[in-house]
Amino acid sequence: MANSLFQKHIISIPELNRSELELIVETAGILKAEPNPELLKNKVVASCFFEPSTRTRLSFETAVQRLGGTVIGFDNGGNTSLAKKGETLADSVQVISSYVDAFVMRHPQEGAARLASEFSNGVPIINGGDGANQHPTQTLLDLFSIFETQGRLDNLNVAFVGDLKYGRTVHSLTQALSKFNNINFFFVAPEILAMPDYICEELDEAGINYSLHASMEEVIPELDVLYMTRVQKERFDESEYAHMKAAYILTADMLAEARDNMKILHPLPRIDEITVDVDKTKHAYYFQQAENGVYAREALLALVLNEQL
């Protein structure tokens, strides 16, 4: 099948339309069920992480190898000769892109992936995270996990809990789900970490339902998806953090009234916002979600590097 993602830069979720998101999710399901080690044969993919990463880097590199491709790159850009010699990002991208067929990049600077796309000589840039801005491939694996567990991406009740102000994963997933029909959002956070105004304004303009809550227990019975995030300790003094943390810890007892189909997602790492007794419940899906990062990234790479599948 032909696809509009061929040779496309993957910089942010708003630049992907519904049909493209559905194509990635569908392809991820196919590749999870039927691995294809020929899709990236003779392809070289750069995996360039200018700040440390575990899940994103390893799942991308696993995806490339499972599809028959070759990976080059680095995991800590600050220790590379290009950083120590003061080479600009633009120059680094121009050089590295001349070696490869696709360029996966994480960078602490917001907007770095878009800048890279201007200097890559047409080689597709895939944003593995640029500061607090965007993390589109996390959103793709989140969508795949939701579809896998719910059988749909329309008609969902979805709650986001914790740090909704600084969490790039919740911003991107909200924007992605907004492209589907009849989505109801529940934003559960302390006022100081509430969903940014620009996200709420986008939802208002699109006529999408959302509500604000201080407690997750009041919304759990209504949910199909509960998306947990950690409250970041560095945002508070010790006493404030202790109070905030206690208000947003999910325990197994709190799931007594949850729908049978409700699944709990988390971008990881988990600190203490989900207690370990939740792991054995039928609702926990965050470790399977992390595994799905391989299949979602396989799908994306296959579509970006193959005009037809």
From Swiss-Prot:
GO molecular function term, any single one: aspartate carbamoyltransferase activity
GO CC field: cytosol
The keyword Transferase appears for this protein: yes
Catalytic activity as recorded in UniProt: carbamoyl phosphate + L-aspartate = N-carbamoyl-L-aspartate + phosphate + H(+)
The enzyme's E.C. designation: 2.1.3.2
Enzyme type, top EC level: transferase
Keyword Magnesium: no
Keywords recorded for this protein, A-Z: Pyrimidine biosynthesis, Transferase
Transmembrane segments: none
Main function: Catalyzes the condensation of carbamoyl phosphate and aspartate to form carbamoyl aspartate and inorganic phosphate, the committed step in the de novo pyrimidine nucleotide biosynthesis pathway.
Assembly: Heterododecamer (2C3:3R2) of six catalytic PyrB chains organized as two trimers (C3), and six regulatory PyrI chains organized as three dimers (R2).
PANTHER family: ASPARTATE CARBAMOYLTRANSFERASE, ORNITHINE CARBAMOYLTRANSFERASE, MITOCHONDRIAL
Family the UniProt entry places it in: Belongs to the aspartate/ornithine carbamoyltransferase superfamily. ATCase family.
Name by which UniProt lists this protein: Aspartate carbamoyltransferase catalytic subunit
Organism: Photobacterium profundum (strain SS9)
Taxon lineage: Bacteria, Pseudomonadati, Pseudomonadota, Gammaproteobacteria, Vibrionales
